Amino acid sequence: MKLLYCMLGLSMAACTPQKTVNGGEDELSMLIGTYTDGTSKGIYSFRFNQKTGTATPLDSVELSNPSYLKPSEDGKFIYAVSEMNDSTAAVNALAFDKQTGNLRLLNSERTPGAAPCYVSTNGKEVLTANYSGGNMSVFRLRKDGTLSPAEALFKGTANGPDTIRQIVPHIHCALFSPDGKYIFATDFSADRILRFTLSSEGNISRLPGEAIGIAPDSGPRHLTFSPNGKFAYLINELSGKVIAFGYTDGKLEQIQSIAADSLRARGSADIHLSPDGKFLYASNRLEGDGIAIFTVDTVNGILTRAGYQPTGIHPRHFNITPNGKYLLAACRDSNVIQVYERDTENGLLKDTQQDILIDKPVCVQFIPPFHN
């Protein structure tokens, strides 16, 4: 069964009911970010049932290239980039109604660097990683959820061996540590991870030498932390390897490097752990598009290859439902979000054939069940 989401130009009223019903703990809010150089409008909201794997379209909002978005912890606000490679590059704050799925733009602020491709928030600040700008920008949040203008800007460097893709600085990811004391940013073109200290007042600083070097020609892309906060895992776009780190009070110590992309297509993309921390998934693009699956030793953080799931074309981003039952892959060039059921015993994936068809999907985010 495939859900066609307004790809034929139908209005939202024709695609969705005007009222929604509270389906209990199994009903999630789901938000989809897209590239808008085709027929896609911007951000789309759905109701997703994490028991059955079915999706119901609710609303959309027009926004240019919202290629990455992040909900606030309470789900009332959404922060989304506009990944534009010019002066219109921005980060946007939106109000979100979890009951109806309605999205409403509150305000936008320009990012000091072009092509913002990642956004994160701790409820007080918002970070953007600006790929073409080669920098990370910081925005303070007002009490009403809106963004203040950018206050700080931290630049990456470029000294990697790839004379095409590492010739200028690129920052691909910026996120807060689980303990909230630090910020980590992937310095793609310098093959390193930058570490910043975050004070209780929200001041951010980086001392000389506060960077974690990795192997040359790696192209660090996305970083994620284990549920228990003891380990971190990095997907490297160019080398196609996952690096496992032990994490203690701001320190990342490498414990393993293992291939996620055996074809060396230089297009690895996203990385996530299952909610129980027992399995890790990493997506690959350009050749052999799919998701590498690993088991995780939750005691020492070591990964073991468990399988590989072919997907649609260009799985730029994916996410796992809070109950761990489903993995949804946003396959940009197949214009589809594929819904996979997870085997919680071995981590393997099974295509449910409950595709969500939407033009150029590149980000999937969930908000926990809503309550009256």
Would you name each region that the model predicts?
Residues 1-27:
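Bacterial Sec-dependent N-terminal signal peptides
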Residues 35-37, 83-85, 131-133, 141, ...:
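Short loop/turn segments immediately following the C-termini of beta-strands
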Residues 39, 63-74, 112-123, 157-179, ...:
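Beta-rich, blade/repeat-based domains predominating
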Residues 47-53, 94-101, 139-148, 197-204, ...:
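Short loop/turn segments immediately following beta-strands, especially the blade-tip
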Residues 56-61, 104-110, 151, 158-165, ...:
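A short beta-strand motif characteristic of beta-propeller blades
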Residues 57-123:
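Blade-loop segments of beta-propeller domains
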